[in-house]
């Protein structure tokens, strides 16, 4: 068990008091909610007292101005990306074959998703999932919202009305995701403060949100754990996700588009996935 995990389970760090004081104004009410919802009080206090657990002002401001239309998905259909995707297909052919046999999902569409989500597992995100979800979840507290607004109010294209609406909506969602993340960390035995992910808290090669892992994550390499940073687990998990949302062998393109839309609610994203899939099959 790593030193970080031991800290999460309750060992105090020498730097904890200063970190706790720094995060106190932001995470005090959040910690109370987590404890009230059944998390161990000592473990939660120790976790949020660690110096690497911070309120992510910069990261959260990116979230508030993100627009899908600004993501250039078309680049993934160029020859360089397609060739890399074909290499990935070959490298993990056994895992793809297993996923296709069990779930009936084409290896090419799984590869397309991994290509677009994480560039075939090479870009997994650099933001702390714990910090991201904790920051968003804490925005249910009006005092915390005001503190954050004062720091990011000069962000381009962001008004107070838009900020308040989005903060209120997403704080509830983020709290559910945070609880799922902490439970997953506990069940799988990893340190929640060490996991990196996207600006919204998605994690692993498959870029699953934490709430999807326990219900849709699969142990592709049969090692007894669900680790979405492992290629075989990610491949099996994506296959199961698509199957659960309606994917079938030989599915028509319009129906495939509806299934993929569940993975990311963006028409541009869906078009890119289908285009890459078709090129890989061609």
Predicted regions and their residues:
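Cell-wall glycan-active module
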Residues: 1-4, 8-201, 205-207, 211-282
